[in-house]
Amino acid sequence: MFILPPPQEALLGAHTSAAGGLHNALYEGRDIGATTVQLFTANQRQWKRRTLTQEMVDQFRIALNETSLSYIMSHAGYLNNPGAPNPEILEKTRVCMHQEIADCISLGISFVNFHPGAALSDSKESCLDRTIASFSQMAPLFENNPPLVVLLETTAGQGSLIGSSFEELAYLIQGIKAHIPIGVCLDTCHIFAAGYDISSVAGWEQVLKHFDAVIGLSFLRAIHLNDSVFALGKNKDRHAPIGEGCIGSDSFCFLMQDERTRMLPKYLETPGGPDLWTKEIRYLQKVC
């Protein structure tokens, strides 16, 4: 199984817009001073995906070369529920997962990020097992060892979502890792909302040690940088600009400096758009 090597530089970017073509997300990344980006490869709120054409692939790969961006991440659609108890939704999700991963391989994308799923009316234990089965079924796509890693995103713990605890993510990874390349994308707002106090250096030290003990730091492959509108442990997913929420700017400077996290690709998902991201990237690169 292919193991994607870590970056050779500290990569920082944002979730940019693919309006008018997937390649435009890369050019917007260049314009805001990013060295990597996250994007949607299809409409995130629809089941039906547009067909990826060779022209789209060529445009994207040309833009990759022209912008020198690397370790691009695709964020899978919001309708996906890999652990859905409803058989129809589960099948739709698995079809979308297959198409998403196949498109990422064609485009030369490094990471594809998924929300782990929601139990809804069923137990979380059953949801976790269905999620493992969903991702394990993607194994044939990786037979030729494409340089792509599937990431499970940490969740805020709202409702019946799974993936808000490191223990749940560890259970998923143990069940999936023999079948496909798998890792974790840590969302700072989400883990704070789920009760992990990362508002100080001391807090981060405890959280990273706990992550390493439960999951293993080798599985931490990327970070979503978001401050939080709501206080610690409120299980509410509401992003705030860096330094303007309940986490605070010192937490993000820690991530930019600490040897365990400095080289992990980082993606802003803060509200405000390109103008704010330009300022945040400059701040994180220069001030931190």
UniProtKB/Swiss-Prot annotation:
Its BP terms in the Gene Ontology are: base-excision repair
Q: Where is Zn(2+) 1 bound in this sequence? A: 75, 115, 153
| Binding positions for Zn(2+) 3 per the UniProt entry | 190, 237, 239
This entry's comment on the bound cofactor is: Binds 3 Zn(2+) ions.
Protein name, please? Probable endonuclease 4
What's this protein's family per the entry?
A: Belongs to the AP endonuclease 2 family.
Q: Identify the coding gene.
A: nfo
The enzyme's E.C. designation: 3.1.21.2
Q: Which InterPro entries match?
A: AP_endonuc_2, AP_endonuc_F2_Zn_BS, Xyl_isomerase-like_sf, Xyl_isomerase-like_TIM-brl
Q: Which organism is it from?
A: Chlamydia trachomatis serovar D (strain ATCC VR-885 / DSM 19411 / UW-3/Cx)
What keywords are annotated for this sequence in UniProt?
A: DNA damage, DNA repair, Endonuclease, Hydrolase, Metal-binding, Nuclease, Zinc
GO MF entry, a single one: phosphoric diester hydrolase activity
According to UniProt, the reaction catalysed is:
Endonucleolytic cleavage to 5'-phosphooligonucleotide end-products
Quote the function comment for this protein: Endonuclease IV plays a role in DNA repair. It cleaves phosphodiester bonds at apurinic or apyrimidinic (AP) sites, generating a 3'-hydroxyl group and a 5'-terminal sugar phosphate.
Which co-factors does it depend on? Zn(2+)
List the NCBIfam families: nfo, PRK01060.1-2
> What does UniProt list as this organism's lineage?
Bacteria, Pseudomonadati, Chlamydiota, Chlamydiia, Chlamydiales
The record, for Pfam families, names:
AP_endonuc_2 (PF01261)
Q: Which residues bind Zn(2+) 2?
A: 153, 187, 224, 269
